Amino acid sequence: MERTFAMIKPDGVRRGLTPEILARIHNKGYRVVGLKQMMMPRETAEQHYGEHRERPFFGELVDFITGGPVVAIALEGENAIAGWRAMMGATNPANAAPGTIRADFATSTGENVTHGSDSPESAERELALFFGDGELLS
């Protein structure tokens, strides 16, 4: 079984999309092994999006992600990384396939409702960043 990190961003939480997104996760057969709603500390956001540090949008991205609660989710299942990314759809909702979370709910590339790890390495790093020892179900 593979694990991945998923997140409902502040725009999704603010718009009350958490129950719908969790239902979609359940309906796809993924197991939620960790879940927490939280205000993301700025330091955590800067670590999480560290690869974008030199990009012009970095400050705005950190401000957005720390500007409201997020839902951090640890998912487990067969091909969880690729499967969750397929469920999310393309980063730009205009390019997202019909029926994906972003096609259905995102309003822009910046406010695209969800995040998902893009590799086993980033999944491991992101899960460790958001969940401490003993916080994930075995």
Swiss-Prot record:
Q: Where does ATP bind?
A: 9, 57, 85, 91, 102, 112
Name its GO BP terms in alphabetical order: CTP biosynthetic process; GTP biosynthetic process; UTP biosynthetic process
- Spell out the protein name for this chain: Nucleoside diphosphate kinase
Q: InterPro entries under this entry?
A: NDK-like_dom (IPR034907), NDK-like_dom_sf (IPR036850), Nucleoside_diP_kinase (IPR001564), Nucleoside_diP_kinase_AS (IPR023005)
**Family label:** Belongs to the NDK family.
Q: What is its subcellular localisation?
A: Cytoplasm
Q: Which organism is it from?
A: Deinococcus radiodurans (strain ATCC 13939 / DSM 20539 / JCM 16871 / CCUG 27074 / LMG 4051 / NBRC 15346 / NCIMB 9279 / VKM B-1422 / R1)
Q: Name one GO molecular function term.
A: ATP binding
Q: Name one GO cellular component term.
A: cytoplasm
Gene symbol here is ndk
| Substrates-to-products reaction catalysed | a 2'-deoxyribonucleoside 5'-diphosphate + ATP = a 2'-deoxyribonucleoside 5'-triphosphate + ADP; a ribonucleoside 5'-diphosphate + ATP = a ribonucleoside 5'-triphosphate + ADP
List, alphabetically, the NCBIfam families matched.
PRK00668.1
- Provide the top EC class: transferase
What lineage is on file?
Bacteria, Thermotogati, Deinococcota, Deinococci, Deinococcales
Q: Which UniProt keywords apply?
A: ATP-binding, Cytoplasm, Kinase, Magnesium, Metal-binding, Nucleotide metabolism, Nucleotide-binding, Phosphoprotein, Transferase
